């Protein structure tokens, strides 16, 4: 049974659609097939889980959009949230 979802093939995180405990199997659909991985940490409902390793400095992609930059290496199955993602909005003052 699927307990997470991705929207776009570019996504490197899935969204938990129910609470997921450390060690649980996380299953989501990608390209018409179910994909599974093991949760490395507890994931709160509607929070993100890495579906592949995300090196420090790489964009975090959800729903096909960059939502931040990994502030540390994030391993497959880990919780992805403010503790390991930083914003990447442009600083408009620097451009003026």
Predicted segments, located by residue:
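Hydrophobic aliphatic residue packing
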Residues: 13-15, 26, 60, 74, ...
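A short, sequence-level motif marking secondary-structure junctions
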Residues: 21, 40-44, 72-76
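Extended boundary segments
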Residues: 1-39
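C-terminal structural segments of small proteins and small subunits
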Residues: 63, 67-94
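Compact, glycine-rich, soluble single-domain proteins
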Residues: 27-63, 69
């Amino acid at each position: 049974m699927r307990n997470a979802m991705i929207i776009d093939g570019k996504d490197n995180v899935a969204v938990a659609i129910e609470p997921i405990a450390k060690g649980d199997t996380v299953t989501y659909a990608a390209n018409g097939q179910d994909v599974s991985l093991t949760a490395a940490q507890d994931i709160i409902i509607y929070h993100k889980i890495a579906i592949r390793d995300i090196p420090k400095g790489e964009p975090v992609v959800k729903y096909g959009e960059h939502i931040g930059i990994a502030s540390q290496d994030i391993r497959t199955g880990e919780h992805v949230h403010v503790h390991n993602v930083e914003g990447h909005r442009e600083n408009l003052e620097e451009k003026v």
